[in-house]
Regions:
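Catalytic core of membrane glycerolipid acyltransferases/transacylases, capturing the structured
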Residues: 55-74, 78, 85-87, 102-159
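Thr-Gly-centered strand-to-loop micro-motif
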Residues: 95, 131-133, 155-156, 183, ...
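Membrane-anchoring hydrophobic helices of lipid-metabolizing enzymes
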Residues: 2-106
Length: 276
């Protein structure tokens, strides 16, 4: 489970108009939510205990022929799916147009409303490596699993780290594995979507691979503030049509960024209106 990041110094300039999001007010947790949350935390701990040896064995077995760590990463993304399926408070679904070939590489981008977005996006049926803040890799067990799965660390504000991360992203794409980036750089703390940064779009143009937009909705209530108990969440990740980059140059980064942001914003607003 990761928190995605973008290289420092790649801020976008797209204007962020005020959006109207759903009411984030969550009623007090009752006995049912307390029991369901306790059960879900137990499931999470059991899954971690099970996944650590499974991933270690998978890594060792596939190491000679899977330099992209596709299989060990694919196994890792299945853990959040199991955790969600056994959490009675959360209902997640994937909609939209899924890629015909999951091994075609994309730069995948999404809006970012909650830490739970990571668990939700893990439901998409293909493997991708996540560009993530380096401090996430320092979390005991979780950070080790991220490293084992081939996710890509980035130290914010460090140009050398940014260059190394972008080189890793290019390597992953050449091995026909997608890269996942939250172009806002961090979670939005309001109903507004932050401006997008340039990094993901520069990467897509340099690698000449399509941008695949995802839209997440409904995760803001999944975690309660200052409470160990979970909230009720009916969340959706929608897969949109890929945006091609053939023939584009680095001079087109800003236009591509703004186009993709507008697509995600429009679809997110439509999803909110449909759920209202």
């Amino acid at each position: 489970m990761t928190e995605s990041a973008e290289p420092a110094g790649t801020d976008g300039t797209a204007a962020a108009a005020p959006d109207t999001g759903q009411d984030d007010h969550e009623p007090p947790a009752g006995l049912g939510a307390t029991l369901a949350s306790a059960w879900s935390w137990f499931v999470f701990g059991a899954c971690v205990a099970l996944w650590v040896p499974m991933m270690a064995i998978t890594w060792l077995v596939t190491l000679p022929f899977d330099r992209a760590r596709w299989w060990v990463g694919y196994l890792y993304r299945k853990m959040p799916v199991v955790v969600q399926k056994l959490n009675p408070l959360w209902h997640f679904r994937v909609t939209g147009q899924l890629p015909a070939d999951p091994r075609n590489p994309y730069v995948v981008v999404s809006n970012h409303e909650s830490f739970v977005d990571i668990l939700l996006i893990s439901h998409v049926p293909w493997e991708m490596k996540w560009l993530s803040k380096k401090e996430m890799f320092r979390i005991p067990v979780a950070g080790w699993l991220m490293y084992l799965s081939g996710d890509i660390p980035l130290e914010r504000g460090d140009r050398d780290s940014a260059s190394a991360a972008m080189a890793r992203c290019h390597q992953v794409l050449r091995r026909r594995v997608s890269v996942m980036v939250f172009p806002e750089g961090t979670r939005s703390t309001t109903a507004d979507m932050r401006p997008f940064k340039d990094g993901a779009f520069r990467l897509a143009i340099e690698a000449q691979v399509p941008v695949l937009p995802l839209v997440v909705h409904g995760t803001r209530r999944a975690l309660r503030k200052h409470d160990w108990r979970f909230g009720h969440a009916d969340a959706e990740v929608r897969v949109m049509e890929p945006v091609p980059t053939e023939g584009l140059t680095v001079d087109d980064v800003g236009a591509l960024r703004d186009r993709v942001r507008a697509l995600i914003l429009s679809e997110r607003d439509a999803m909110r209106q449909a759920a209202a």
